[in-house]
Amino acid sequence: MAHMIMMRKILIEKMGAVLFYQPGLLYGGSIEHDCNLQRSIGYYLEALLMLAPFMKNPLKATLRGITNDPTDPTVDRLKSTVLPLMKKFGIEGEGFDLKVMKRGMAPGGGGEVVFTCPVRKTIRPVQLTDSGKIKRIRGVAYSVRVSPQMGNRIVESARGVLNQFIPDIYIHTDHMKGANSGKSPGFGLTLVAETLEGCFLSAEMSSTPQGQGDPVLPEDLGRNCAKLLLEEVYRGGCVDSSNQSLALLLMTLGQQDVSKLLLGPLSPYTIEFLRHIRDFFQIMFKIEVRKPLEDERKGGDKVLMTCVGVGYSNLNKSLK
């Protein structure tokens, strides 16, 4: 965080139990960081995605470490769901991208990701009240330092579940070799369901890190990941459960106009995040429960979130 912020002050108490952190302006620019191997790159990207549009200069962040693990959102999931979501709020352009240069599984890492994001002065309000029906499913089955057949076995088992519901399914295999394959063996699957209204719902699973717990079969991983996607589709909404907090933050920071967003059941993380929004921005959301009719077959109960943005303006942005 200190790499991209013009720091004012960081003080650590002598006993190491207290940290005083006073940030300055969000400077941005080109940064490189070797992420701690206790968490994956997705853990760091979650914060970067929230801050990147409000930098002084366009951000180019090169992050090295673990790209895929069972704990944090993987880079594949963030690229497939978060970037399209942010584009709905007006955060887009040629310089908005997330690339996997090297793939690194837990626990050794060795992956590399490049995230680029333009700056924006304001965030536009949104009206996302209808998710629409699922029109297609896409995915990536990745593997490193194991047999390439692992990816094919994952794809076959996942399709065995999903083909019962929709024919338009394409899951490609990504097997990186040599220097691009990181330091640890592993495999996994990321699935994304796209709706007729351009909403994205996702699910993912990764193999157990080497030396940690019982190994998982690729067939079991593929089937279980497909079932997780079906559960996410049942929950529904215009944003999947892993990205609810980001969408609500962008609604809060939007122009002083009404924004509406239809979500599935709120996750515990999102509920706590709403408390933070209330404390820091004094914004309270109007929450309406939407119960689908029995003949609609639209999954579980939904929640319509409504708020008026604070009208945040990016004062860090360079004037040209």
Regions of interest found by a model, annotated:
Residues M1-K320:
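Structural preference for solvent-exposed beta-strand-turn elements
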